[in-house]
């Protein structure tokens, strides 16, 4: 029997609105500012799809980007996004501010995923899934 029900994944960042907008361009989910500080700065921003929060972004003072694949500030989580064509999706990602990691876990062009960084430095992956037909 489950102890709890999974709710969402939240990413720490210096600017939750900017990071939510970045991921909204990838997913087409709605950006919702959920919590403001006393001076009106967004503290918690959510990506919502059909009324369900999927990803949240939390403002963290003195945020430091993770280093990937190794380094003094290790990644603690990453997101995967399925796409029908890696090359087409990569072109679109780079246009909205993603950075392709200079280090890929394999140099085999037949691999089915690629690693990128979002504007706050979190690594995320595109995963080839040719069964997707609605993008």
Region roles according to the model:
Residues 71-93:
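Mid-chain, well-packed structural core segment of small domains
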Residues 2-3, 10-55, 88-89, 94-117:
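Core segments of cupin and vicinal oxygen chelate
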Residues 6-8, 77-78:
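Short active-site oxyanion
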């Amino acid at each position: 029997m489950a102890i709890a029900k999974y709710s969402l994944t939240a990413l720490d960042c210096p600017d939750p609105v900017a990071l939510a907008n970045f991921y909204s361009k990838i997913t087409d989910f709605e950006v919702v500012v959920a919590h403001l500080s006393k001076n009106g700065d967004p503290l918690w921003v959510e990506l919502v799809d059909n009324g369900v929060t999927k990803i949240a972004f939390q403002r963290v003072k003195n945020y430091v980007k993770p280093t990937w694949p190794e380094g003094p500030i290790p990644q603690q989580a990453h997101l995967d996004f399925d796409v029908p064509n890696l090359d087409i999706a990569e072109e679109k990602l780079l246009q909205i501010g993603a950075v392709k990691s200079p280090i890929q876990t394999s140099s085999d062009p037949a691999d089915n995923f690629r690693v990128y960084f979002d504007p706050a430095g979190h690594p995320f992956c595109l995963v080839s899934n040719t069964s997707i037909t609605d993008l």
